[in-house]
Design a protein with these regions (language model features):
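Specific pore-lining/lateral-gate transmembrane helices of multi-pass inner-membrane transport
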Residues: 70-87, 246-293
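Membrane-interface junctions at transmembrane-helix termini in multi-pass inner-membrane proteins
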Residues: 4, 8, 69-74, 124-148, ...
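Signature of the first transmembrane helix
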Residues: 5-63, 97, 101, 152-157, ...
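Residues that define the loop-to-transmembrane-helix transition and helix capping
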Residues: 39-42, 83, 113, 142-143, ...
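Hydrophobic alpha-helical transmembrane segments
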Residues: 113, 117-120, 147-193, 213
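Interhelical loop/hinge segments that connect adjacent transmembrane helices in multipass membrane
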Residues: 1-7, 117, 143, 185-228, ...
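Helix-loop interface residues and adjacent transmembrane-helix termini in multi-pass membrane transporters
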Residues: 35-38, 109, 138-139, 166, ...
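Alpha-helical transmembrane segments of multi-pass membrane proteins
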Residues: 53, 57, 90-94, 98, ...
Length: 293
């Protein structure tokens, strides 16, 4: 298979794999606006914004490391990477639980504190869903990666229709958490990832190696959040949740254009990892860079 064909194939896998997590918010928009008031939709948008901010911080962006280091590694080394990253994320989740518990006792009143356990549920379920899905990219199971997007799409749709019309914001949170958990479990077993998981494979050197790669990525994630999401918490105090909900709806269509480039970027990273050690990699890389520019 030629490099261009491989890149196109990876793009198709990435698009399908992200249908549930990235595109469902757009496709379900007519239903969300029918089921939820503008204020309620503004609340759900803020919950997702806060969860997205904390996603890479709480997990130290470990999901980005887990699809890089297994490439070309021995099976034992892959087990070390996967088990170490998985256990590390579990420990981070426990620490986050206690931090959130402490924050919940603050006397301040805002969307974050009032819905702190909703945010925690969305955050942690998303951490493990993203980790298990991205691991498939690291072990060259892109077809499984894409199929998980279909699973997440189906579960999100079903749970949304079942829960949101009667439960409102609470139903939205349950549907999001349920879809993340279902997708993570499906990926974990369907990709045979469980075969790579063992507490005995914990490796301090592997953890250090992955953290050296992932921690420098955290500021980039935060800066992207500041660009795309900081206005939400600020506007909450100035214009209220009703106006925030209208703004969230209006921003869905322009956000699709950003997603299109994001899909290409993810597929390009996968292709670069696969081609990196080949002799003519520099020529190929520069050619693609000139084409994009």
């Amino acid at each position: 298979m030629g490099r261009s064909d491989k890149l196109v194939k990876n793009i198709s896998f990435i698009v399908i794999g992200n249908i549930g997590s990235k595109l469902m918010g757009f496709f379900m928009l007519p239903f969300y606006t029918n089921w939820l008031s503008p204020a309620d939709y503004g609340t759900t948008d803020l919950l997702i914004v806060y969860a997205n901010l904390l996603l890479n911080v709480v997990a130290c962006d470990m999901s980005d490391a887990i699809y890089i280091y297994p490439v070309g590694a021995t099976k034992q080394k892959v087990c070390n990477y996967y088990s170490t990253g998985f256990i590390f994320q579990f420990l981070c989740s426990i620490i986050c639980l206690f931090v959130f518990w402490g924050i919940s006792y603050l006397s301040m009143k805002n969307i974050f504190i009032d819905n702190i356990w909703f945010i925690y549920g969305i955050l942690i379920s998303n951490v493990f869903q993203k980790y298990t899905q991205d691991f498939c990219r690291g072990i060259n199971q892109m077809s499984v990666f894409s199929f998980t997007g279909i699973v997440q799409t189906i579960t999100t749709t079903l749970l949304s229709f079942l829960l949101i019309p009667t439960q409102g914001v609470y139903g939205f949170v349950l549907a999001t958490i349920g879809a993340n958990i279902a997708t993570a479990l499906f990926t974990f077993f369907y990709s045979n990832s469980y075969k790579y998981l063992s507490i005995n494979d914990w490796d301090k050197e592997a953890l250090t190696e992955m953290l050296r790669f992932s921690i420098p990525l955290i500021p980039t994630s935060i800066l992207w959040w500041l660009i795309s999401g900081l206005n939400r918490p600020l506007l909450e105090d100035y214009v209220g949740l009703f106006a925030l909900g209208l703004m969230a709806v209006a921003g869905k269509l322009p956000g699709i254009m950003n997603l299109i480039f994001n899909f290409f970027q993810q597929a390009w990273i996968v292709t670069v990892v696969e081609e990196y050690k080949k002799l003519d990699f520099a020529i190929y890389y520069n050619k693609m860079f000139q084409m994009i520019m």
